[in-house]
């Protein structure tokens, strides 16, 4: 995904559980600990490993786009029926908005797609976190937190 900021070395994402396809638990996990849906911001798979998923999507695009709200819902549904993903450890990939920052308040006047936070925070992800994800608002380019400004390129 393009709305992520690399926080620390990402090598372990490529060496963890070789041969398995991996993704992350959706960030509602921070509000519902048993939430088992996927977030598609970070996925790792070997070439050809998910060809069946792609072929099903390619052959049924219109129907799939009508049935599912987005790619994450389709991927989760496909995986349930075919080959569930192995999950990266939650602490390796964090939601900037829900798991790194403390304040979630929006600045006044912003519209969805162009909002930013009301306050600037000097937080940074812990040493185990490789990637921070910006799902929904704000996008990294709209976030004024120093860590994001310094690392978003």
Residue ranges and their predicted role:
Residues 1, 38-40, 70:
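A conserved catalytic-core signature of glycosyltransferases
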Residues 1-35, 44-45:
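GT-A fold catalytic core of metal-dependent nucleotide-sugar glycosyltransferases
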Residues 8-11, 33, 38-40, 53-58, ...:
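A short secondary-structure junction signal
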Residues 16, 27, 35-38, 54, ...:
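Sequence-level detector for tyrosine residue identity
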Residues 19, 39-40, 128-129:
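Short, surface-exposed beta-edge/turn micro-motifs
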Residues 47-153:
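Catalytic core and acceptor-binding pocket of nucleotide-sugar-dependent glycosyltransferases
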């Amino acid at each position: 995904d393009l709305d992520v900021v690399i926080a620390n070395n990402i090598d372990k994402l490529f060496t963890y559980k070789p041969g398995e396809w991996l993704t992350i638990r959706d960030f509602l996990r921070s509000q519902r600990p048993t939430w088992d849906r996927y977030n598609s911001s970070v996925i790792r798979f070997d070439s050809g490993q998910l060809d069946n998923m792609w072929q099903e999507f390619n052959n049924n695009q219109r129907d799939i786009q009508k049935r599912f709200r987005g790619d994450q819902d389709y991927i989760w549904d496909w995986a349930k029926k075919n080959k569930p993903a192995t999950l990266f450890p939650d602490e390796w990939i964090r939601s900037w908005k829900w798991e790194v920052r403390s304040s979630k308040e929006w600045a006044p006047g912003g519209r969805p797609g162009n909002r930013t936070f009301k306050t600037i925070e000097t937080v940074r992800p812990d040493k185990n976190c490789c990637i921070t994800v910006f799902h929904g608002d704000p996008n990294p380019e709209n976030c004024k937190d120093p860590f994001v400004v310094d690392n978003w390129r």
